[in-house]
């Protein structure tokens, strides 16, 4: 399963992508987190449904200095990503 999440709020410049990468790797997920020009962070993660749901919990919480306002999600089929990167 593949999760696409657009995270809005104060999520850039606060270590959000590194936070996401750490939890994604711990959960055995593959994908990436990327800052977007509109101030959002896009997270693409692939793996089993339980791990994706657990990651979604952390996406909504964020690191201490982040202020997550919304997480818009979409699910689709996996595409075979490997590792978890930050862009």
UniProtKB/Swiss-Prot annotation:
Location of the active site: 17, 35
Reaction catalysis annotation: an acyl phosphate + H2O = a carboxylate + phosphate + H(+)
EC number from the UniProt entry: 3.6.1.7
Pfam family, one: Acylphosphatase
Organism superkingdom: Bacteria
Keyword Manganese belongs to the record: no
Keyword Hydrolase appears in the UniProt entry: yes
Domain Acylphosphatase-like: 2-87
Protein family: Belongs to the acylphosphatase family.
Protein name: Acylphosphatase
Species of origin: Deinococcus radiodurans (strain ATCC 13939 / DSM 20539 / JCM 16871 / CCUG 27074 / LMG 4051 / NBRC 15346 / NCIMB 9279 / VKM B-1422 / R1)
